[in-house]
């Protein structure tokens, strides 16, 4: 029996997860390692006060294909690359046949870089930098071929993982994420790429009545910033928000109520997609970290 040893790397806005899987020929998982986590703030040089370039500026630069990446943004994206490399190095004692890598944000046309990033630094040359580091510093005769969308990867995880909740499901909505939001649609057993449908906006593109995006209203980063903007984003800060809301603190209660409205709006937006095709989702799956937030 031939086996494939695949290292999966899941980059996010605040950290990187990596895990080694062993597959049979039919893509059935037969074994897996424990998850390794590397936070960006563990890497020397990380800038806790870094603020992403405004989205309207990012969109204009993508449209004109003229990216003005500041030194601060380059430095912060370098921290991300180092964290990803650390995540790969952790598993070099094991056999690795293939590498798979997903990351949030809008990708470059060739899926080799990040052109828009709502919760972090852009890096149009991310794949090139990673592959150069893999060859030079690790010595693996393997390259990353593309950057997969984190939202699509989340849905695929639910479809193919032994414990996945979307096995044998034709139509479903997935909403997950951590610092940001990752959501996806499974339609007629096919994974929908939101970027390929003009009428399907991502959570950071859907505007609430208060002028904020859905992601700003219900993600970990968004909730923390609304609660105490100057403090580092953390689960502890989120728990403090929930505790104050349970005590009827007015500002905390308003933030939580708006988060619930944002969640409902996102569900309504995704339901409208199915209604347009006279179908109805069999399941709505909430990711583990998003479930904790909700």
Task: Give the location of each predicted region.
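Active-site metal-binding loops of divalent metal-dependent hydrolases
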Residues: 151, 179, 290
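Adenine-nucleotide phosphate-binding core of ATP-dependent small-molecule kinases
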Residues: 65-95, 224-285, 290-293
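Glycine/GP-enriched mid-protein hinge/lid loop-to-helix segment characteristic of carbohydrate kinases
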Residues: 3-5, 17-59, 135, 143-146, ...
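N-terminal phosphate-binding loop and adjacent alpha-helix
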Residues: 30-94
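Glycine-rich phosphate-binding loop and adjoining helix at the ATP-binding site
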Residues: 73, 77-81, 94-171, 294
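Glycine-rich phosphate-binding loops at beta-strand->alpha-helix junctions
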Residues: 12-15, 101, 107, 118-121, ...
């Amino acid at each position: 029996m031939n086996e494939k040893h695949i290292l999966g790397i899941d980059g996010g806005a605040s950290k990187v997860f990596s895990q080694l899987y062993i597959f049979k020929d039919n893509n059935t998982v037969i074994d897996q390692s424990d998850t390794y986590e590397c936070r960006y703030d563990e890497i020397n040089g990380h800038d806790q006060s870094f603020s992403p370039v405004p989205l309207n500026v990012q969109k204009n630069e993508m449209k004109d294909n003229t990216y003005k990446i500041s030194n601060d943004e380059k430095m912060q994206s370098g921290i991300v690359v180092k964290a990803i490399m650390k995540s790969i190095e952790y598993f070099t004692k094991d056999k690795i046949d293939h590498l798979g890598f997903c990351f949030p944000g809008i990708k470059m046309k060739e899926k080799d870089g990040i052109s828009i990033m709502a919760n972090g630094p852009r890096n149009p040359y991310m794949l090139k930098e990673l592959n150069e580091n893999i060859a030079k510093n690790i010595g693996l005769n393997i390259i990353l071929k593309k950057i997969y969308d984190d939202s699509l990867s989340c849905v695929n995880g639910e479809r193919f993982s032994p414990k996945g909740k979307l096995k044998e499901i034709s139509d479903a909505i997935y909403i997950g994420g951590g610092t940001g939001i990752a959501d996806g649609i499974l339609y007629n057993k096919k994974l929908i790429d939101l970027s390929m449908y003009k009428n399907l906006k991502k959570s950071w593109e859907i505007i609430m009545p208060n002028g904020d995006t859905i992601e700003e209203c219900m993600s970990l980063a968004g909730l923390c910033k609304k609660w105490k903007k100057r403090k580092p984003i953390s689960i502890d800060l989120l728990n403090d928000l929930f505790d104050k809301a349970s005590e009827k603190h007015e500002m905390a209660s308003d933030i939580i109520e708006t988060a619930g409205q944002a969640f409902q709006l996102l569900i309504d937006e995704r339901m409208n997609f199915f209604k347009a095709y006279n179908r109805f989702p069999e399941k709505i799956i909430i990711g583990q970290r998003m479930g904790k937030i909700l």
